[in-house]
């Protein structure tokens, strides 16, 4: 996608209504939709579809925001400037969509920007180029020195001479609270939430639509959305198509509420941190656990918790110690919760959004970052499902691309 296409799609997308009544006004019957997955992406799809008048049922195997959405750093940003233009556009528009949703409900989001810095092992040499590319694409981003960064985050301790990227319009979302809020809003519009329910099979019906077999019963629907994060790969296989992923684990720790310390999202090479509106500081790391057979065996089932509270505490204190080197005011924080987040990510790193190959009933919505993209993806999925209108913004992200791999 070149810059002209980018600007054309940007103009067209901003003209789209938040909730379309086209299908209802034309007299066309609205589809009955099952959403598999009660994370932030599934919750956004459910709310947007329910707002259009669709009959919506959400099936969840574990709990609301129990998987990736409950263990996510939840930094809202437009990407890194090295990604395809179409993906950059999707993320950029999603930031605006979060603001639009916040006009309809009290979404717990803070728009305090972000500061990112790196070391040699994490791509420090490419950061200036990425900032330049982001600016060329229309994203407000600046390269700062240490003094400039300290004016934004007082007390920040980074090595002299370190360049930092300032993303002025980035934000931070409370993922679990946002997911619950979206589902509550969907339920107020008639959506149903069923859990714990495991999907055992997904099959096409001879007369059209799809039958979802669970561990307790079967549900007939016109459409099903697979939005189960890392679990979407197995669901896709049951539905008869391939959706490979390269999932990655990361430790997330939360402190007890504390007075305001962080004025922005801080994303360092070995730790990242943000402070929610409730005072809790979220700590995370980009690198996963060390490689080795012991870790591989323990992580094979993708657990969200550590096997021993003492091990969890060690990981939390490790992240806190790293964060405190950059922001000494965090040294007195108390770790309250530590978990493992599994990032859903299709094998080529790009979202997989749209109908499965050869199907008009099975729709996928799996991606990284779901926190950033969820607001827009829910809206666009509702347009495609309720209105039956393909959205050009999603053309590069169809799941059918894996069929030819």
Name every feature range the model reports, one short phrase each:
Residues 259-358:
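Active-site lid/adjacent beta-loop-alpha segment flanking the redox-cofactor pocket in flavoenzymes
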